A protein has these predicted regions:
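Aliphatic-rich helix starts adjacent to a transmembrane/signal segment
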Residues: 2, 8-61, 65
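N-terminal cationic leader/targeting segments used for protein routing and processing
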Residues: 3-7, 118, 147
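Residue-level recognition of strand-loop junctions within catalytic nucleotide-signaling folds
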Residues: 19, 84-86, 158
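Short, well-structured beta-strand/strand-turn elements
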Residues: 65-74
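Type IV pilin-like appendage domain
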Residues: 73-146
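Short linear sequence signals and composition-biased patches located at protein termini or domain-edge surfaces
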Residues: 131-177
Length: 177
């Protein structure tokens, strides 16, 4: 075995073991941070998908509950969805149209256009990341049943790789003519 002289530089076994232990702790912490960042991004995308589905359904639900007349397109999506009603107290007429617009691949925005007393249309976007594409997942669509008077709304949103699908059944107020 070779002897080390006093001026000779090198690491002892204890120093190597301490360095290895520190390196292991740093690598473990780095790995945990990377996993947390990936999970956080996925959770954030999932929350965006849920919130967009809920927001779009909420607006359609509010208008559909008031509707005295519901019209859906005969296309596979059922859009545009047109809701008409007249208020009982003031006789104000409303026409609200929902349509899927501004496609970016399979993702659309849900546009709401409101016309009060045949006036100027007010247009807003009430939902984003609305999915209409090859299945799966299920496509966004709406259907009106003339027998049961129920509007069935299927909303699918996709944010990143996260997909959220919801089905709503809405029964508008009865029309008394």
């Amino acid at each position: 075995m070779k002897r080390m002289h006093k001026n000779q530089k090198g690491l002892t076994l204890v120093e190597l073991l301490v360095a290895l232990a520190i390196l292991t702790v740093v690598a473990g912490a780095t790995n945990a941070v990377i996993i947390q960042m990936m999970q956080s991004s996925r959770t954030s995308a999932h929350m965006v998908a849920i919130r967009q589905a809920q927001s779009a359904a909420y607006r359609i639900n509010c208008d559909a509950l008031q509707a005295q007349e519901v019209k859906v397109n005969n296309s596979s999506s059922g859009f545009p969805l047109i809701l008409n009603w007249t208020t009982w107290d003031a006789g104000t007429t409303y026409q609200v149209t929902y349509n899927l617009v501004n496609p970016l691949g399979d993702l659309y925005e849900l546009q709401r256009e409101e016309i009060v007393n045949n006036g100027t249309p007010l247009t807003t976007i009430v939902g984003q990341y609305i999915y209409r594409g090859p299945e799966p997942p299920r496509n966004t669509s709406c259907r009106w049943d003339n027998t049961t008077y129920v509007l069935t709304l299927n909303i699918t949103t996709k944010a990143g790789q996260e997909v959220e699908a919801r089905t709503y059944k809405i029964k508008p107020r009865p029309y008394v003519g």
